[in-house]
Amino acid sequence: MRRTFSTAATAALLGLAAGNTAQAALFAVDSGPYGNDTAGFAAWYQDSHGRVLDLCLSKALSSRVPGTPDAPSYMCALLPEPGVFDDNEDIVFPGNFPSEAFWFTADAFIQQGGINLGYGAALEAAFNTEQPVDGDQISFARIRLRVDLTSAGSYTITHPYGVEVFEVTAEDLGTDGVGAINLTRDIGIGAPGDFSGALKGDVGPFLRSVNGPYEETNPDTGTLERFVGDPNLEEQVTGSPFGTNYLRIQGPNGLDLRTELFAVSGKLSTVQRPTPLIIQRSTYSRDSDASGATLQSQDLFVQAPPPPGLASFRDSAGASVEMTEADGTGHWYGQSTAAPTTARPLRPMQRPPCPPSWSTR
């Protein structure tokens, strides 16, 4: 049996502040029209931290990890498939295109003491028929867990995008414990050509290497491209909406294993997009102190790009109120003591660096 916690419950389990309970994973997607250069898929997705990732089809190679002719060290997650996609040839749609492509991937592994845990998060482009056929294009946000275990019991897995709890039985273990935990959660699959469903998935904001961004040259175009990570390396990352930039498994007999190393892929877009700003909660409270004086406050919680960006709001009195962000997750809070009025509603504003700079928070 598996229990997946809601975003609010996840925040509570992780001990986050009340204003951090809403996860705004992805913010926007390319609305088209969609051409053959992206095989009929959306060209980009934008997350709530403001980063925009293109569908990663570049054959740029890692300058940090050498590849081989049979296994090039691509910066994008390109998956050769006999009879479908030959990565030695030009990527062309239709004709020579992978059955799966990605805007973003993040993978991590834990192998210790009989535990073999594989984790994957992805924003994926695929086809309904599992073959690259025009008119069958779909996208989805995926969370995948595969765990081999040695004993039954209750297991909690914490990852950058949530918390999963599994009650593993002897029947789940079988004879060898292989695949005792087996979870694939795909969110966002809609009608072919509708790529908006993935905005409601569990993936996002995009994880990124603390050592990035990386720049590599596209061998086909000669242009310099920027990537959020190198999928050929395992590195520390940032970007979790809960601040859980790690993979952890806890279980029976004091089991507690953890890694902070991920292999991440994603190509930063040159598309310029408006800065994301999502109002999570706005409240007004009024009371009086012992002397009878009125105490009042307007409180505003928003999701926006974290520092070095800035956020503020204009209160009902017309004054600018600077907001604060405590943990690099993009959850901002501000308070004003002005009395509310229907004639002047709160007006939040976000001021990021322009262009958005790289933050390792």
Question: What role is predicted for each listed range?
Answer:
Residues 55, 67, 71-82, 87-93, ...:
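Short, surface-exposed binding/anchoring microloops in extracellular/periplasmic proteins
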Residues 22-61, 65, 77, 275-288:
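Boundary/junction segments of secreted and surface-exposed precursor proteins
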